[in-house]
């Protein structure tokens, strides 16, 4: 995997092929379809990068808006052993970079049933709080944050 620029074509490709867990999350939190959610996220971000898989296909986009870090992806994001390894290694470097750039704690909300994301967030050093109602649907989400 490698970092690439989040062009319009990349945004469309990831938005139209978003993994189910991320689609559910953006619908419950903001009542948005995947393409609209990822487009708005990219446009509002202060820092933004896209992720290309080993096969050259975009598999995700991540960014930070104010102090809110986010990642939306396709099933390709974790489809191979190589992708999973890079996501863990590069993910930690990305979060460290974002913390340095923002200069304040960063965090966001994750749907409580999105167990893979919660496990990954903890691996990246985030504190994940207990579920509470959040967003458009009032579904249970866990706030997560990291200060250093």
Question: What are the residue ranges of the model-derived segments?
Answer:
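Short amphipathic alpha-helix that is part of the acyltransferase structural core
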Residues: 1-32
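A short helix-loop-beta-strand connector motif used in the catalytic cores of GNAT acetyltransferases and
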Residues: 38-53, 57, 139
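Conserved acetyl-CoA binding element of GNAT-fold acetyltransferases
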Residues: 65-86, 142
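Conserved acyl-CoA
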Residues: 89-106, 126
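C-terminal "cap" of GNAT-fold acetyltransferases
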Residues: 134-148
